[in-house]
């Protein structure tokens, strides 16, 4: 089968045409992939950065954002059948640790990542445990279903705290950040302000519903808050950038008693003014992945009640032009990039 493989310990990802079709275990489902999306993680793997060198076994079929149809099921699988349209949770958990048994599988200490620690979905076929398969309703388009993984990150982060009537600050206008903007507006936030230094992505944030999209290299966030009539700071912060300066600016802009959800991963150690956290009584919450499967339920429910995340998909390529997809993702001048397998 065709697959995109990290086959060398160097910058790049390469297509092969002779990867073996994965076998199906008794508790597994094999999915024929229709569309894949490129994740920021895939770009890290492409770049072969420090994290990738520590983490990715080579060779590895990468990718974990996709939609497809069930091709085959294992002998013990009863919930899915060939032809079902599905996507899949990219975190494979142990099922037996304390958190898994308590229903907190997103906090499993033994998580294995599809396309990171086990073969991924940049391939004509991918195999995952049946417990990780999620059926896609007929009224959700393929290309939207293909980005359920990052949409789930945005949903988990945005819905961590009450948003109705609140003023929300989103730091980082990448695809997950701008989807969080749309979610916050959809569920009833008042002002949703997003900060970044990338004008292309700030423009995308405006299209996704941001009250204000602020280039902090040129604009003063405090002046924007004053212009919006905000006197006490933001009530909820969604840190999506992984940038220490953005996080510190967020802490300064939060109201007393505010709540901050952090999804962005900062490189190394970042110093902050902890007195801001203590004296403001801030609540900080780390976010990882998606709650299994409450986040998925909410993702579908919001789409079916009018949320439109489709503007975040800005580029589409056939799979044989995957290099163009990675090039545009690496340029920073895109939202989500979807690759079509032509099946």
UniProtKB/Swiss-Prot annotation:
Co-factor requirement: Zn(2+)
Note on cofactor: Binds 2 Zn(2+) ions per subunit.
Active site: 41, 44
Binding site for NAD(+): 176, 196, 201, 263-265, 287-288
EC number per UniProt: 1.1.1.103
Binding residue positions for Zn(2+) 2: 94, 97, 100, 108
Gene Ontology cellular component list: cytoplasm
Annotated site residues (Important for catalytic activity for the proton relay mechanism but does not participate directly in the coordination of zinc atom) in this chain: 149
Any one GO molecular-function label of the UniProt entry: L-threonine 3-dehydrogenase activity
Residues the entry annotates as binding Zn(2+) 1: 39, 64-65
Task performed by this protein: Catalyzes the NAD(+)-dependent oxidation of L-threonine to 2-amino-3-ketobutyrate.
Binding partners and assembly: Homotetramer.
Name used for this protein in its record: L-threonine 3-dehydrogenase
Organism: Anaeromyxobacter sp. (strain Fw109-5)
Lineage: Bacteria, Pseudomonadati, Myxococcota, Myxococcia, Myxococcales
């Amino acid at each position: 089968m065709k697959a995109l493989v990290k086959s060398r310990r160097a910058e790049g990802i390469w297509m092969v045409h002779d990867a073996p079709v994965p076998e199906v275990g008794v508790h597994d489902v094999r999915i024929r992939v229709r569309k894949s999306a490129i994740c920021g993680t895939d770009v890290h793997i492409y770049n072969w950065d420090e994290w990738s060198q520590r983490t990715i076994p080579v060779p590895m079929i990468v990718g974990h954002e996709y939609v497809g149809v069930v091709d085959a099921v294992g002998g013990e699988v009863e919930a899915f059948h060939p032809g079902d349209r599905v996507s899949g949770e990219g975190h494979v958990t142990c099922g037996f640790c304390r958190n898994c048994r308590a229903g907190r599988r997103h906090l499993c200490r033994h998580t294995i990542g599809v396309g990171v620690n086990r073969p991924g979905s940049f391939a004509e076929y991918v195999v995952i445990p049946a417990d990780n398969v999620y059926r896609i309703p007929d009224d959700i388009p393929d290309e939207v279903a293909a980005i359920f993984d990052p949409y789930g990150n945005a949903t988990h982060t945005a819905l961590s705290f009450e948003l109705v009537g609140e003023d929300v600050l989103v730091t980082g206008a990448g695809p997950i950040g701008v989807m969080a903007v749309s979610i916050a507006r959809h569920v009833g936030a008042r002002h949703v302000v997003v900060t970044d230094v990338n004008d292309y992505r700030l423009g995308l944030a405006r299209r996704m519903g941001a009250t204000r999209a602020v280039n902090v290299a040129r604009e003063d966030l405090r002046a924007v808050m004053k212009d919006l009539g905000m006197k006490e700071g933001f009530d909820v912060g969604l840190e999506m950038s992984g940038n220490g300066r953005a996080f510190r600016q967020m802490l300064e802009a939060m109201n007393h008693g505010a709540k901050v959800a952090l999804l962005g991963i900062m490189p190394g150690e970042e110093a902050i003014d902890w007195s801001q956290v203590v004296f403001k009584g801030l609540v900080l919450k780390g976010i990882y992945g998606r709650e299994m499967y409450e986040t998925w339920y909410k993702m579908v429910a919001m789409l079916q009640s009018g949320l439109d995340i489709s503007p975040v998909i800005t580029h589409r390529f056939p799979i044989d032009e995957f290099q163009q997809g990675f090039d545009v993702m690496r340029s920073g001048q895109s939202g989500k990039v979807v690759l079509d397998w032509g099946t």
